[in-house]
Amino acid sequence: MSETFFHLLGPGTQPNDDSFSMNPLPITCQVNDEPSMAALEQCAHSPQVIALLNELQHQLSERQPPLGEVLAVDLLNLNADDRHFINTLLGEGEVSVRIQQADDSESEIQEAIFCGLWRVRRRRGEKLLEDKLEAGCAPLALWQAVTQNLLPTDSLLPPPIDGLMNGLPLAHELLAHVRNPDAQPHSINLTQLPISEADRLFLSRLCGPGNIQIRTIGYGESYIKATGLRHVWHLRCTDTLKGPLLESYEICPIPEVVLAAPEDLVDSAQRLSEVCQWLAEAAPT
């Protein structure tokens, strides 16, 4: 995973309103959706890694994990050849996640080209603590992290600042939906509202910083940051020229753009089965 793919996040990194530009239709980013069989043929690997893939494929054929759960196999003890083989097979899909954990470790998560399959690695410094391949709508570490932030109270409202236009009513709207799970998901689309920089600063102070950063690609790119409030996300979407398309606060456990759909998991299970069958047929006798 690239160490710099979050460099466009944060204040001052997005174009100002006077530089706003948008293509009539966003251009699709190219994402490979099939592993390169020619490349896999060149990768040395052991029966152990094939057994792990078969195990995960078998689990997926038996049941599809519900929201909040995953199926998983442990890759931590793979040798260098098997690790390279897995990297080649999985590739990089549309979603990348980085989570700063409370114990000072960091989880790096990359969706595979098989939608709903996630490579999950946790490190502390240079030490690799966990390496798993998970199948589910979202990785387990993300489900666990999104429940740890605060539930808000009115005492969290920051003091008003000069230049506020809609910041205060938007803050009350946001807090009301966070407190009521039945009112979620809810989106506050800043792009469609008259909003000042003071409003943005006020909402940012209300929500505070979070410990999760997500990048998705597809039609343009989306940069999503968890805030310090439970189930509140700040989302920015850009087109392929980095022009702004959307800025919003999303109030939900995990934004829908991050989740793999059930039908995606079914498709990935079928494709993984075909790859496992191909590997079995290609194995030397």
Where in this protein do the model-derived segments appear?
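Short, surface-exposed polybasic-aromatic patches that bind anionic ligands, especially phosphate groups
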Residues: L53, P169-H172, A176, P185, ...
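N-terminal alpha-helical "arm" segments
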Residues: M1-S36
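Short, structured protein-protein interaction patches enriched in aromatics and acidic/basic residues
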Residues: N77-A80, S96-R119, I212-K242
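Terminal, regulation- and interaction-focused segments at domain boundaries
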Residues: E62-D74, N180-L193
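An N-terminal, globular interaction/scaffold subdomain
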Residues: L25-E108
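Extracellular/lumenal glycan-associated surfaces
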Residues: D82-G91, P194-G210, H231
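C-terminal structured domains
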Residues: I212, G218-T285
